Amino acid sequence: MSAIPFQTIDWNQIIKTEHHGETGNAYWQTIQLGNLRIRKVTYTENYIADHWCQKGHIVHCLEGDFISELENGEKFSLSKGMTYIVSDDVSSHRSITTKGVELLIIDGDFLK
């Protein structure tokens, strides 16, 4: 990965893309810097991801709360100000929220 010069991100200027869950929707605002992806993601009320994700992430909860469920049945509750970290192909996981949540998600080759 090459050096990233100082820059600011005005999330109000980043286009939202819609992604359907098993229930509810996710809205992504994505910045791609080489192999580094930074997303501000909003899950609507009663959102359940439609797949088990195997990608590594750093996930920080900006607003609301959600459950990160692992494929082995473990569940972790996260709320505003909390973060989780997982590497690629270590723990398949999915997100669930009843009230909606706003997350900052960072992923890339550094999590392999």
Positions of predicted regions on the chain:
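Conserved short histidine dyad/triad with adjacent acidic residue
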Residues: 34-53, 87-90
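Short acidic-glycine-tyrosine-enriched beta hairpin
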Residues: 72-89
